[in-house]
Structures are given as C-alpha cells and as structure tokens.
Regions:
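Anionic-ligand binding region
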Residues: 113-152
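Core catalytic region of metal-dependent phosphoesterases/phosphodiesterases
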Residues: 1-65
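Acidic, His/Gly-rich catalytic cores of divalent-metal-dependent hydrolytic chemistry
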Residues: 140-253
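Conserved hydrophobic/aromatic beta-strand scaffold that supports enzyme active sites
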Residues: 83-85, 95, 138, 165-167
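Active-site neighborhood of phospho(di)ester-bond hydrolases with catalytic His/Asp-centered motifs
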Residues: 1-6, 27-32, 96, 127-132, ...
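Active-site environment of divalent metal-dependent phosphoester hydrolases
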Residues: 9-12, 33-39, 127-140, 154-157
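Active-site-proximal segments of metal-dependent phosphoesterases and phosphodiesterases across multiple
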Residues: 48-56, 89-123
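Metallo-beta-lactamase
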Residues: 57-92
C-alpha cells in the first residue's frame, strides 16, 4: 500500500493519521505539507492564491497540524521520499504527490498531453501515479500512463460525500487500474473539525462534496463542478515496456 502525501492537513486527526499509516507499514510519499512541517515552515505551500477561501482553509488545517503533531512525527516526515518507485508487470512506475519536479503542482484531467508527456519524461518511468489535484482519473499518453488516484481525505468536487482511492492489479502483460469510491463517516469528521475550531470551509466541503469556488482548477475541468463521478477502470497494456531491474521501496529522499 502506498499513500501519496498530504496526510496532515485534512480534517482534525493529523497525528492519528500518521500513526495509523506507520503502524501498518504503509509507504508514504512526501507532499508539500510533509516537506514543510518537517522543517517548521509556517505555510503549507499548497499553491492556492493568497487570501483565497482555499488558502484560508488550507492554512487553518496546516496550523492545526503544526500544533498537534509530535516532534518525532515531524522528523519522520523529513525522512520521506519525494518519489517512490516500484515495478509491476515489467512496467516501472513512480508515485509522486503532485508533479514530478513540483510537489504542489495540480495536474487535472484536462491537462494537455504535452504537459503530461513532459512530466513522464522527467520521471524516467513508464507511468506516474499522483494525487494533488484530488480528482481521480487515468490518462494514456502514447504508451505511457498518468494516473491520479484521487484523495482519500476530501471529496472530488462532485457533490457526493465520498472519498477516492485506486487499486492496481498486475497480470502478465497489463495492469488493471481501478478507481474506487469510499463511503466514510463524514458526520464524525465534520464534528471533529468544528470542535477543533478549524475553518468551516473544510466542514462545508465534507458536507456538500464541493470545493470552494476559488480553488485553482483548469477552465475545462471547472466547467462541470458537482457532476457525480463514477467508479472506473483501465486495462493498461505493458507489452511494449522494456524490462527493468526490480525496484525497492524508497525510504529517504
């Protein structure tokens, strides 16, 4: 199991989330939040416009995490890799939080092929799995894969009270990539947010399934906010992939 970063700034259970991931030996990739908490930076660096509703929301969550996460956990965050790699069905895959070289880059479903091709080339892999844009989707560019796993901690702006994750299953000549929805106790999460005094925009997003309107998102992707997403799957052929040495888990940058 791999978690693609951002564990500290959603809802009110930052320390408990970190403890859960570590207890179960989940591979965690550093997002912009982990990078900054580990060195004591005062802003999350999520990439939102200064003073926007999303910036205020993110700052509220980040400040709460900064005050509740243990020092030892911050040190652990500083040891996390920026990219984790593994080999499956001969394909060499990378897991990043946002972009390959820019941790807080949001890559949305309507991102041009040229941009994805550049990111994939920089990765040096056959495919990349990321998360920062929080919308689950799969794109094939030439024979390569760009996949956004969705967020396990925030609805996907589709007006449903669900979270998203991805299951990848290997076969001899392909990888089956399934985007799955997760129902969760949103009422309990909202109650904790309110009790902790976090920005109400965070609670509103969980209750409505919609993000603040000023969230940075491409015009094409923003055209249909609130349209319910459906679970989907892609069978990605790895027949043309050149075999590579088996990758090990990365435990440090």
């Amino acid at each position: 199991m791999i978690y693609s970063g951002g564990l500290a700034t959603y809802c009110a259970d930052a320390q408990a989330t970190a403890d859960l991931l570590r207890t179960h030996d989940v591979v965690v990739v550093a997002g912009n939040v982990e990078e900054r908490l580990s060195v004591g930076v005062k802003h999350c660096g999520c990439g939102f416009n200064e003073g926007s509703a999303c910036d205020v929301l993110a700052s509220s969550r980040y400040d709460h995490a900064g005050h509740t996460i243990y020092k030892e956990t911050n040190c652990w965050m500083g040891s996390l890799p920026h990219i984790a790699t593994f080999t499956m069905s001969r394909a060499h895959l990378a897991v990043a939080h946002g972009g390959v070289t820019q941790t807080n880059r949001s890559i949305f479903p309507a991102t041009p092929d040229e941009d994805l091709r550049r990111e994939l080339q920089l990765s040096g892999t056959d495919g990349v799995i990321a998360e920062h844009s929080e919308i689950p989707y799969s794109r094939q560019v030439d024979s390569q894969l760009w996949h956004n796993a969705g967020a396990i901690s925030m609805p996907a702006n589709d007006r449903t009270l669900r979270l998203w994750y991805t299951v990848v299953t290997p076969s001899s000549d392909s990888i089956y990539i399934k985007i799955q929805a997760l129902d969760f106790n949103w009422r309990g999460a909202v109650a904790k947010i309110r009790a902790a005094g976090l920005s109400l925009a965070c609670a509103d997003a969980l209750e409505s399934g919609l993000w603040p309107r000023d969230k940075i998102i491409s015009s094409d992707d923003q055209a249909q906010p609130g349209r319910p997403l459906t679970e989907s799957a892609l069978k990605w052929s790895t027949r043309g992939v050149m075999p590579k040495p088996k990758s090990q888990r990365i435990a440090a940058p």
